[in-house]
Design a protein with these regions (language model features):
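Compositionally biased intrinsically disordered regions enriched in Thr/Gly
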Residues: 1-232
């Protein structure tokens, strides 16, 4: 489907970012197949390096990460569209501002793909405005600390409490799930964001730690579980 691929070359991607300045929408339709989305127009509002930071480093990193996400959306969309999956494919991308203050910008880019069924996926970005640094999960903790173990233990505790209260269903030991399916630990680079209260929120994809009925589970980590190893 070369015409479809050529048309998608005009879909806008995100430029250097520090602050959301405007909104930009895009759309494309090919018969019963449609790609649409709304992206933030972002600008680097701090061209002068902050103390200990480098000018534009966070903006450039955010730009590259966002470009990779949009490329993934396009690639997945084209894969289904080229196969005329049940005659209809639709991909819709949007974003959510999770936190935007003087210290932190946290964004979520999300996509819903409909192709005989609905699949949701997303990616999270957290930018330290003071340093211009795009944060990884490990950046939040003291070097050499077992943050994976501490965070994983608190998530497992929350999962067990929700299951016991009939408020959730997760792949945890002691239930109907096999050992291979059960949650043991987060990835060192697990998706996360920092909420408006400074809390660490860990996010999982669909079916990663729970049945599809649970969507994309989020867990706010108890500060007491990580206070002795948290660096920022």
């Amino acid at each position: 489907m070369p015409e479809l691929a050529r048309a998608l070359e005009g879909v806008p991607v995100l430029g250097p970012v520090i602050r959301i300045a405007d909104l930009r929408t895009y759309g494309f339709r090919w018969g019963d197949t449609a790609l649409s989305g709304e992206l933030p127009v972002l600008e680097d509002a701090s061209p002068t390096p902050a103390a200990g930071g480098t000018a534009g480093s966070g903006a450039e990193a955010m730009n590259e990460a966002a470009d990779e996400y949009i490329a993934q959306v396009r690639e997945t969309f084209l894969w289904y569209a080229a196969r005329e999956y049940q005659g209809y494919v639709a991909s819709d991308t949007g974003y959510q501002v999770l936190r935007d203050d003087d210290a932190i910008l946290s964004l979520c880019f999300y996509t819903t793909l409909n192709a005989g069924g609905s699949v949701d996926y997303s990616r999270y970005f957290t930018l330290d405005k003071a340093t211009g640094e795009l944060l990884a999960l490990s950046d939040l903790f003291l070097e050499g600390s077992d943050y994976v173990g501490a965070v994983s233990a608190d998530i497992l505790r929350q999962m067990e409490e929700q299951v016991a209260a009939g408020e959730g269903d997760y792949f945890i030991p002691g239930g109907i799930w096999s050992e291979e399916e059960c949650f043991r630990a987060i990835d060192p680079d697990q998706q996360f964001y920092l909420d408006e209260n400074g809390g660490l929120v860990i996010v999982f994809g669909e079916y990663e730690v729970a049945p599809g009925s649970m969507g994309m589970p989020r867990f706010v980590i108890d500060e007491e579980a990580i206070s002795d190893i948290r660096a920022r």
